[in-house]
Design a protein with these regions (language model features):
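N-terminal [4Fe-4S]-dependent radical SAM core
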Residues: 2-26, 36, 244-314
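Catalytic cores of nucleic-acid editing and processing enzymes
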Residues: 1-5, 9, 32, 70, ...
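Short strand->helix junction
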Residues: 37-38, 319
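Glycine-rich beta-alpha loop elements in corrinoid/cobalamin-binding modules
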Residues: 36, 44, 63-264, 269-273
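Acidic/glycine-enriched edge-of-secondary-structure segments
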Residues: 1-6, 55-58, 109-120
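Short helix-loop-beta junction
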Residues: 47-59
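Local cysteine-cluster metal-coordination motifs and their immediate loop/turn environment
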Residues: 313-321
Length: 321
């Protein structure tokens, strides 16, 4: 990774005053997150922001934007030069909001003072729809655990219903699943080189919506056609079969491209990247994180930070997984 020459401050900017202080007249990428901004390598938004910064891009973060007012948080940096990035946060928003008994939780570990209500249900959908309404011509890339787990048809426990890919609901241009450093940097380079977002179709570890006619007619060595969303809706065994295929292909070094038709469209899920090398993951952890919450929180307690403040990252992903 090449370190950015414009690194002049400790935290990535989250306010217009900070970008003005840096002398920026534009921002390359604006990242929206359902979590408070903690500049630590255990927080996905911080990692993606720092990795993009290390590649020379100007990155701003909008943590926990207000989606219920005049949408000023979504407008404060204006239109980025490359794209918007959206993540619900380090935890699935519905797990964050509700107990297993579907009762509303009273706190949020990723919010200052543990306050509940700083993010909506399904922020991936809510934030992306707002951005698409304000900036219809600007690409929106979604990622994080909420988007990753919903990249294909999935059972939503809280709605007690089978739902199609979250891409069909949020209308994002690309979904990045799993560890996102490699795909997000590749996407940034392609957009910067002049490639249209609609032409970015084959980046590993991404999912996109294509026309139904683009779906292959039969399986081969590199493509696997899943049961359609409609078939899964009518037969839960079909959904179980899909789940098995998705898990198998997600754990292969050279998996197949997955295809699933839904609502007269087709979801294309490109295979995983090979695991990060020791050098790559060390480079990611060695970026200039402050390992602190942003000063705007004025020392307010963020429970998730209290848990990891003295920790050292040993791995990526869920240790139990």
């Amino acid at each position: 990774m090449e370190k950015s020459n414009n690194y002049k401050q400790q935290w990535l900017p989250i306010t217009k005053k900070e970008t003005d202080r840096l002398g920026w007249d534009y921002v390359d990428v604006v990242l929206f997150s359902g979590d408070a901004y903690i500049d630590h390598p255990s927080m996905g938004c911080a990692v993606i922001g720092r990795v993009l910064e290390a590649h020379g891009y100007r990155v701003a973060i909008v943590p926990q934007p207000n989606w219920q007012d005049d949408l000023r948080d979504f407008k404060k940096f204006g239109k980025p030069r490359l794209f918007f990035g959206v993540s619900a946060g380090a935890m699935d928003s519905m797990v964050n909001h509700y107990t297993a008994a579907r009762r509303k939780r009273s706190d949020d570990a990723y919010t200052p003072n543990g306050r509940h209500g700083a993010r909506p249900d399904y922020p991936t959908i809510v934030y992306t729809k707002i951005l698409k309404s304000l900036y219809p011509d600007t690409p929106v890339i979604v990622g994080g655990i909420e988007a990753s787990l919903r990249r294909l048809s999935h059972y939503d426990y809280w709605a007690d219903a089978l739902k199609p890919s979250i891409l069909l609901d949020c209308k994002a241009d690309i979904l990045v699943y799993g560890m996102g450093e490699k795909p997000i940097c590749e996407i940034a380079k392609l957009i910067e080189s002049g490639t249209k977002i609609s032409d970015i179709k084959d980046v590993k570890q991404t999912a996109i919506i294509v026309n139904k006619s683009d779906c292959p007619k039969e399986n081969d060595d590199s493509n696997l056609i899943l049961n359609s969303f409609e078939n899964c809706l009518n037969n839960r065994i079909k959904q179980a079969e899909n789940f098995k295929h998705i898990e198998i292909e997600s754990n292969k070094w050279h998996g197949k491209t997955l295809w699933q038709t839904a609502n007269n469209k087709c979801v294309k899920v490109n295979p995983m990247n090979e695991p990060m090398t020791e050098e790559e993951i060390d480079a990611s952890f060695d970026l200039p994180y402050t390992r602190l919450p942003h000063p705007k929180y004025n020392g307010k307690r963020i429970p998730a930070y209290e848990m990891i403040r003295h920790s050292v990252n040993l791995h990526r992903g869920c240790f139990g997984g």
